[in-house]
């Protein structure tokens, strides 16, 4: 079971068993059985599963502006190619928000951390508008650490943001002298592990709206979890994963180096046991070097498959403007709900969702499917 380090706080309990999708709710159907003699018989309670799939949906027009005046009759919904009926429809403004910031603090990000810190502080101040709204902060490099657990306290979150620092090149080299994690490129970047842990250990049991914002160059080095398992963890917990691609033009980081850290004996900490490697045992990644990885495409895939959006910081699209766009989306989403209607309704496994708008020139942003377990 994958865990991460909690700084200055008590560790959260690990989840046990198979993760269940948050879109399944149990309802009790009570049937009173009457006897034929005219005397009331004993009431029998039968529990049945009523599977309600919830979709956070953002709709934009051809100019990229968010559309807010739609009804459920303006959408066409299918699951695995079969038409579905939208039974629940609302705008999500008043639902509680659970928000997570996952900040890449590897060497490749050290020159942009100050800008990220300042913009993140303003973003959290803007998004946490009620006591029911809570946020957490995780940083990841050669380890994954929870700097601030779920809280509605802006002061605690600000303090956690102030503690964000990238490891020094000297420290990374000392931690991994054989350069098994590509320390000259950043000393390990456990992006996939961070997404997996945030989803399973923090988001899994939270109600209402759930979103994570990643600030990274998108290149993973050393995660125990795969890209696919990270995406699946977010999908199973109904978590939107927004990505902000922020690269330092003065850093020579490109390329996806081997997956040394996070595997038994690899570089990086934050995992239980075994020195800086975290996982017990020995050995490093599968290969000393792997092919170049396009971090932008990685972040695009993560966000697309979880129903969110990837943004790229540039001169015309600064990080504070990107945060404003994310805030607007989260405030103006529609919430659609339906009960799957088909022969094998709610069958175990992955179910593909297709949502389209009847009106022309409208684009739909929502998750592409969900997992149903036994």
Q: Language-model features: where?
A:
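N-terminal secretory signal peptides that target proteins for export/translocation
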Residues: 1-23
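Bacterial Sec-dependent signal peptides at the C-terminal "C-region" and cleavage site
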Residues: 8, 35-44
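An N-terminal low-complexity intrinsically disordered segment enriched in acidic/polar residues
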Residues: 16, 20, 28-29, 44
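Residue-level detector of transmembrane insertion/anchoring sites
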Residues: 16, 26-27, 94, 207
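Bacterial N-terminal signal peptides
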Residues: 25-38
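Scaffold/interface architecture of coatomer-like assemblies
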Residues: 40-374
